[in-house]
Amino acid sequence: MNRPERLQPGVKLRDADKVSRIPVKIVPSERDTMLRKPDWLRVKLPASNQRILEIKQALRKNGLHSVCEEASCPNLAECFNHGTATFMILGAICTRRCPFCDVAHGRPLKPDAEEPVKLAQTIRDMKLKYVVITSVDRDDLRDGGAQHFADCIREIRKLNPDIKIETLVPDFRGRIDAALDILSTEPPDVFNHNLETAPMHYRKARPGANYQWSLDLLKRFKERHPNVPTKSGLMMGLGETNEEIAQVLRDLRAHNVEMLTLGQYLQPSKFHLPVERYVPPAEFDELKALADELGFTHAACGPLVRSSYHADLQAQGKEVK
Protein backbone atom coordinates (compact mmCIF):
# COMPACT_ATOMS: atom_id res chain seq x y z
CA MET A 1 0.00 0.00 0.00
CA ASN A 2 1.43 3.37 -1.04
CA ARG A 3 1.68 6.06 1.60
CA PRO A 4 0.16 9.47 0.77
CA GLU A 5 2.72 11.91 -0.55
CA ARG A 6 4.00 14.19 2.21
CA LEU A 7 2.70 17.73 1.88
CA GLN A 8 5.26 20.43 1.27
CA PRO A 9 5.00 23.53 3.49
CA GLY A 10 3.31 26.47 1.81
CA VAL A 11 1.95 24.55 -1.19
CA LYS A 12 -1.75 25.16 -1.82
CA LEU A 13 -3.93 22.21 -2.80
CA ARG A 14 -7.23 23.05 -4.46
CA ASP A 15 -10.17 21.35 -6.15
CA ALA A 16 -9.47 17.65 -6.93
CA ASP A 17 -6.13 17.66 -5.07
CA LYS A 18 -7.80 19.08 -1.97
CA VAL A 19 -10.72 16.63 -1.71
CA SER A 20 -8.91 13.47 -2.82
CA ARG A 21 -8.69 11.93 0.68
CA ILE A 22 -11.91 12.92 2.44
CA PRO A 23 -14.30 10.23 3.80
CA VAL A 24 -17.12 10.85 1.30
CA LYS A 25 -15.83 10.74 -2.26
CA ILE A 26 -17.01 13.46 -4.60
CA VAL A 27 -17.70 12.71 -8.25
CA PRO A 28 -16.82 15.81 -10.30
CA SER A 29 -19.98 17.51 -11.51
CA GLU A 30 -20.69 17.53 -15.23
CA ARG A 31 -22.01 20.77 -16.67
CA ASP A 32 -25.28 19.20 -17.81
CA THR A 33 -26.01 17.83 -14.31
CA MET A 34 -25.37 21.08 -12.42
CA LEU A 35 -28.46 22.99 -11.34
CA ARG A 36 -28.98 26.27 -13.15
CA LYS A 37 -28.55 29.28 -10.88
CA PRO A 38 -31.87 31.10 -10.39
CA ASP A 39 -32.33 34.80 -11.07
CA TRP A 40 -32.48 35.68 -7.37
CA LEU A 41 -28.81 34.67 -7.02
CA ARG A 42 -27.49 37.01 -9.68
CA VAL A 43 -25.07 39.51 -8.13
CA LYS A 44 -25.13 43.17 -9.16
CA LEU A 45 -21.69 44.57 -9.91
CA PRO A 46 -20.81 48.06 -8.65
CA ALA A 47 -20.56 50.93 -11.12
CA SER A 48 -16.93 51.58 -10.11
CA ASN A 49 -14.21 49.17 -9.00
CA GLN A 50 -11.85 51.83 -7.63
CA ARG A 51 -12.54 50.99 -3.97
CA ILE A 52 -12.14 47.29 -4.75
CA LEU A 53 -8.69 47.89 -6.23
CA GLU A 54 -7.67 50.05 -3.25
CA ILE A 55 -8.55 47.33 -0.75
CA LYS A 56 -6.81 44.62 -2.77
CA GLN A 57 -3.68 46.78 -3.04
CA ALA A 58 -3.69 47.42 0.72
CA LEU A 59 -3.93 43.69 1.40
CA ARG A 60 -1.12 42.83 -1.04
CA LYS A 61 1.13 45.60 0.28
CA ASN A 62 1.06 44.13 3.79
CA GLY A 63 0.95 40.45 2.84
CA LEU A 64 -2.55 40.05 4.28
CA HIS A 65 -5.42 37.83 3.15
CA SER A 66 -9.18 38.27 2.97
CA VAL A 67 -11.59 35.37 3.20
CA CYS A 68 -13.61 37.27 0.61
CA GLU A 69 -10.99 36.38 -2.01
CA GLU A 70 -9.67 33.07 -0.67
CA ALA A 71 -13.15 31.54 -0.33
CA SER A 72 -14.50 33.08 -3.57
CA CYS A 73 -17.35 34.90 -1.82
CA PRO A 74 -20.09 36.08 -4.22
CA ASN A 75 -20.40 39.36 -2.29
CA LEU A 76 -16.77 40.41 -2.72
CA ALA A 77 -17.49 43.29 -5.09
CA GLU A 78 -20.30 44.69 -2.94
CA CYS A 79 -18.39 44.45 0.34
CA PHE A 80 -15.09 45.78 -1.01
CA ASN A 81 -16.93 48.65 -2.69
CA HIS A 82 -18.67 49.32 0.64
CA GLY A 83 -15.20 49.56 2.22
CA THR A 84 -15.40 46.40 4.31
CA ALA A 85 -13.39 43.19 4.27
CA THR A 86 -13.09 40.09 6.40
CA PHE A 87 -9.42 39.57 7.19
CA MET A 88 -8.12 36.00 7.27
CA ILE A 89 -5.18 35.54 9.62
CA LEU A 90 -2.73 32.66 10.10
CA GLY A 91 -2.10 32.27 6.37
CA ALA A 92 -4.22 31.11 3.44
CA ILE A 93 -3.68 27.34 3.81
CA CYS A 94 -6.11 25.28 5.91
CA THR A 95 -5.23 21.99 7.59
CA ARG A 96 -8.69 20.60 6.78
CA ARG A 97 -10.37 19.63 3.53
CA CYS A 98 -14.03 20.69 3.86
CA PRO A 99 -15.44 20.04 0.37
CA PHE A 100 -17.86 22.97 0.40
CA CYS A 101 -15.06 25.49 0.95
CA ASP A 102 -12.76 27.05 -1.66
CA VAL A 103 -9.91 27.87 0.75
CA ALA A 104 -6.78 25.88 -0.12
CA HIS A 105 -5.64 22.86 1.90
CA GLY A 106 -2.07 21.97 2.70
CA ARG A 107 0.73 22.22 5.22
CA PRO A 108 0.73 25.83 6.45
CA LEU A 109 3.78 27.95 7.05
CA LYS A 110 4.69 29.17 10.53
CA PRO A 111 2.45 32.08 11.63
CA ASP A 112 3.76 35.53 10.72
CA ALA A 113 4.69 37.19 14.01
CA GLU A 114 4.39 40.61 12.34
CA GLU A 115 0.85 39.99 11.09
CA PRO A 116 -0.96 41.50 14.11
CA VAL A 117 0.86 44.83 13.71
CA LYS A 118 0.49 44.86 9.91
CA LEU A 119 -3.20 44.10 10.28
CA ALA A 120 -3.69 46.91 12.79
CA GLN A 121 -1.88 49.39 10.54
CA THR A 122 -3.90 48.36 7.49
CA ILE A 123 -7.18 48.77 9.37
CA ARG A 124 -6.08 52.22 10.54
CA ASP A 125 -5.08 53.25 7.01
CA MET A 126 -8.41 52.01 5.64
CA LYS A 127 -10.26 53.98 8.36
CA LEU A 128 -12.45 51.02 9.21
CA LYS A 129 -14.87 51.16 12.15
CA TYR A 130 -15.93 47.49 12.18
CA VAL A 131 -13.77 44.53 11.20
CA VAL A 132 -14.23 40.78 11.05
CA ILE A 133 -11.19 38.62 11.76
CA THR A 134 -11.29 34.96 10.77
CA SER A 135 -8.72 32.25 10.11
CA VAL A 136 -8.07 28.95 8.47
CA ASP A 137 -8.07 25.87 10.70
CA ARG A 138 -4.60 25.44 12.22
CA ASP A 139 -4.66 21.95 13.72
CA ASP A 140 -0.86 22.03 13.51
CA LEU A 141 -0.65 24.63 16.28
CA ARG A 142 -0.81 23.67 19.95
CA ASP A 143 -3.47 26.31 20.70
CA GLY A 144 -5.20 26.13 17.31
CA GLY A 145 -4.17 29.72 16.65
CA ALA A 146 -5.91 31.26 19.67
CA GLN A 147 -2.89 33.30 20.78
CA HIS A 148 -2.56 34.80 17.31
CA PHE A 149 -6.21 35.89 17.46
CA ALA A 150 -5.60 37.53 20.84
CA ASP A 151 -2.45 39.24 19.55
CA CYS A 152 -4.33 40.61 16.54
CA ILE A 153 -7.17 41.97 18.67
CA ARG A 154 -4.73 43.64 21.06
CA GLU A 155 -2.71 45.33 18.30
CA ILE A 156 -5.82 46.42 16.40
CA ARG A 157 -7.23 48.14 19.48
CA LYS A 158 -3.92 49.88 20.19
CA LEU A 159 -4.08 51.74 16.88
CA ASN A 160 -7.87 51.83 16.50
CA PRO A 161 -9.35 52.49 19.97
CA ASP A 162 -12.92 53.07 18.74
CA ILE A 163 -13.15 50.01 16.52
CA LYS A 164 -15.56 47.10 16.90
CA ILE A 165 -14.07 43.64 16.31
CA GLU A 166 -15.91 40.46 15.40
CA THR A 167 -13.99 37.19 15.40
CA LEU A 168 -15.07 34.23 13.29
CA VAL A 169 -13.09 31.43 14.88
CA PRO A 170 -12.39 27.77 13.99
CA ASP A 171 -13.49 25.00 16.37
CA PHE A 172 -10.11 24.61 18.15
CA ARG A 173 -10.57 20.85 17.96
CA GLY A 174 -9.56 19.19 21.23
CA ARG A 175 -8.26 22.49 22.62
CA ILE A 176 -11.43 24.40 23.48
CA ASP A 177 -10.63 25.20 27.12
CA ALA A 178 -7.03 26.21 26.39
CA ALA A 179 -8.17 28.35 23.47
CA LEU A 180 -10.88 30.07 25.51
CA ASP A 181 -8.39 30.80 28.30
CA ILE A 182 -6.27 32.67 25.76
CA LEU A 183 -9.15 34.39 23.94
CA SER A 184 -10.52 35.61 27.25
CA THR A 185 -7.49 37.87 27.63
CA GLU A 186 -8.67 39.89 24.60
CA PRO A 187 -12.37 39.18 24.03
CA PRO A 188 -13.92 40.54 20.81
CA ASP A 189 -17.09 42.59 20.52
CA VAL A 190 -18.86 39.71 18.74
CA PHE A 191 -17.83 36.04 18.94
CA ASN A 192 -18.77 34.03 15.84
CA HIS A 193 -18.32 30.34 15.04
CA ASN A 194 -20.17 28.70 12.17
CA LEU A 195 -21.97 25.37 12.50
CA GLU A 196 -22.30 25.41 8.67
CA THR A 197 -24.91 22.63 8.37
CA ALA A 198 -27.08 20.13 10.25
CA PRO A 199 -25.26 17.37 12.19
CA MET A 200 -26.32 14.51 9.88
CA HIS A 201 -24.40 16.19 7.04
CA TYR A 202 -21.13 16.72 8.93
CA ARG A 203 -19.40 13.61 7.62
CA LYS A 204 -19.66 14.76 4.02
CA ALA A 205 -19.42 18.52 4.56
CA ARG A 206 -17.20 19.02 7.64
CA PRO A 207 -14.87 16.02 7.96
CA GLY A 208 -12.83 16.41 11.12
CA ALA A 209 -15.41 18.63 12.82
CA ASN A 210 -17.97 17.74 15.48
CA TYR A 211 -21.39 19.37 15.85
CA GLN A 212 -21.49 19.17 19.65
CA TRP A 213 -17.96 20.51 20.01
CA SER A 214 -18.96 23.56 18.00
CA LEU A 215 -22.05 24.14 20.13
CA ASP A 216 -19.97 23.73 23.29
CA LEU A 217 -17.42 26.28 22.06
CA LEU A 218 -20.15 28.88 21.60
CA LYS A 219 -21.77 28.10 24.95
CA ARG A 220 -18.55 28.09 26.95
CA PHE A 221 -17.44 31.42 25.51
CA LYS A 222 -20.83 32.92 26.40
CA GLU A 223 -20.55 31.60 29.95
CA ARG A 224 -17.23 33.42 30.32
CA HIS A 225 -18.38 36.61 28.57
CA PRO A 226 -22.14 37.03 29.06
CA ASN A 227 -22.09 40.57 27.63
CA VAL A 228 -20.45 39.61 24.32
CA PRO A 229 -22.95 38.52 21.63
CA THR A 230 -22.40 35.06 20.16
CA LYS A 231 -23.19 34.29 16.54
CA SER A 232 -23.27 31.34 14.13
CA GLY A 233 -23.89 30.75 10.43
CA LEU A 234 -25.44 28.01 8.31
CA MET A 235 -25.66 27.11 4.62
CA MET A 236 -28.61 25.62 2.78
CA GLY A 237 -28.55 23.50 -0.34
CA LEU A 238 -26.41 20.57 0.85
CA GLY A 239 -29.28 18.11 1.13
CA GLU A 240 -30.66 19.24 4.47
CA THR A 241 -34.37 19.67 5.16
CA ASN A 242 -35.91 22.82 6.58
CA GLU A 243 -36.84 20.89 9.72
CA GLU A 244 -33.20 19.86 10.19
CA ILE A 245 -32.20 23.51 9.97
CA ALA A 246 -35.02 24.45 12.35
CA GLN A 247 -33.62 21.98 14.89
CA VAL A 248 -30.16 23.53 14.53
CA LEU A 249 -31.70 26.91 15.33
CA ARG A 250 -33.25 25.43 18.46
CA ASP A 251 -29.90 23.91 19.43
CA LEU A 252 -28.17 27.26 18.97
CA ARG A 253 -30.66 29.02 21.21
CA ALA A 254 -30.32 26.24 23.80
CA HIS A 255 -26.60 27.07 23.83
CA ASN A 256 -27.29 30.81 24.26
CA VAL A 257 -26.34 31.90 20.73
CA GLU A 258 -28.01 35.23 19.91
CA MET A 259 -27.16 36.09 16.29
CA LEU A 260 -27.68 34.03 13.14
CA THR A 261 -26.74 34.08 9.46
CA LEU A 262 -28.37 31.74 6.97
CA GLY A 263 -27.48 31.66 3.26
CA GLN A 264 -27.41 29.56 0.10
CA TYR A 265 -24.50 27.20 -0.54
CA LEU A 266 -22.80 27.83 -3.90
CA GLN A 267 -20.49 25.23 -5.44
CA PRO A 268 -17.00 26.76 -5.94
CA SER A 269 -15.95 24.23 -8.61
CA LYS A 270 -17.04 20.94 -10.13
CA PHE A 271 -14.79 19.15 -7.62
CA HIS A 272 -16.70 20.50 -4.60
CA LEU A 273 -19.97 19.26 -3.13
CA PRO A 274 -22.79 19.83 -5.61
CA VAL A 275 -25.70 22.15 -4.89
CA GLU A 276 -28.65 19.84 -4.23
CA ARG A 277 -31.21 22.62 -4.43
CA TYR A 278 -31.52 26.38 -4.59
CA VAL A 279 -33.66 27.52 -1.70
CA PRO A 280 -36.28 30.16 -2.65
CA PRO A 281 -36.22 33.50 -0.80
CA ALA A 282 -39.64 32.73 0.70
CA GLU A 283 -38.19 29.76 2.61
CA PHE A 284 -35.43 31.95 4.02
CA ASP A 285 -38.15 34.36 5.16
CA GLU A 286 -39.94 31.49 6.92
CA LEU A 287 -36.76 30.45 8.72
CA LYS A 288 -36.08 34.05 9.72
CA ALA A 289 -39.57 34.20 11.24
CA LEU A 290 -38.76 31.06 13.22
CA ALA A 291 -35.43 32.54 14.35
CA ASP A 292 -37.22 35.67 15.57
CA GLU A 293 -39.76 33.50 17.37
CA LEU A 294 -36.98 31.51 19.05
CA GLY A 295 -35.46 34.69 20.43
CA PHE A 296 -32.42 35.43 18.25
CA THR A 297 -31.62 39.12 18.67
CA HIS A 298 -30.68 39.32 14.99
CA ALA A 299 -31.13 36.89 12.11
CA ALA A 300 -29.87 37.64 8.59
CA CYS A 301 -31.49 35.10 6.28
CA GLY A 302 -31.34 35.20 2.49
CA PRO A 303 -29.73 33.49 -0.52
CA LEU A 304 -26.64 35.74 -0.63
CA VAL A 305 -26.20 36.17 3.13
CA ARG A 306 -22.80 35.09 4.40
CA SER A 307 -21.41 35.00 7.92
CA SER A 308 -19.67 38.36 7.67
CA TYR A 309 -21.97 39.96 5.06
CA HIS A 310 -22.68 43.50 6.32
CA ALA A 311 -21.54 42.29 9.74
CA ASP A 312 -21.46 45.88 10.97
CA LEU A 313 -25.15 46.30 10.18
CA GLN A 314 -25.94 42.92 11.73
CA ALA A 315 -24.23 43.98 14.96
CA GLN A 316 -26.35 47.15 14.98
CA GLY A 317 -29.51 45.04 14.64
CA LYS A 318 -30.35 46.37 11.17
CA GLU A 319 -32.14 44.26 8.58
CA VAL A 320 -29.80 42.29 6.28
CA LYS A 321 -30.93 39.79 3.63
UniProtKB/Swiss-Prot annotation:
Residues reported to bind [4Fe-4S] cluster 2: C94, C98, C101
Gene3D superfamilies cross-referenced by the UniProt entry: Aldolase class I
Cofactor annotation: [4Fe-4S] cluster
MF terms in GO: 4 iron, 4 sulfur cluster binding; lipoate synthase activity; metal ion binding
UniProt superkingdom: Bacteria
UniProt subcellular location: Cytoplasm
Claim: Lyase is one of the keywords in the record: no
EC number of the protein: 2.8.1.8
Cellular component GO terms held in the UniProt record: cytoplasm
Keywords: 4Fe-4S, Cytoplasm, Iron, Iron-sulfur, Metal-binding, S-adenosyl-L-methionine, Transferase
Cofactor: binding details: Binds 2 [4Fe-4S] clusters per subunit. One cluster is coordinated with 3 cysteines and an exchangeable S-adenosyl-L-methionine.
Transmembrane segments: none
Pathway linked to the protein: Protein modification; protein lipoylation via endogenous pathway; protein N(6)-(lipoyl)lysine from octanoyl-[acyl-carrier-protein]: step 2/2
Chief place of localization: cytoplasm
Family per record: Belongs to the radical SAM superfamily. Lipoyl synthase family.
NCBIfam families: lipA, PRK05481.1, PRK12928.1
The protein, known as: Lipoyl synthase
Natural source organism: Shewanella baltica (strain OS155 / ATCC BAA-1091)
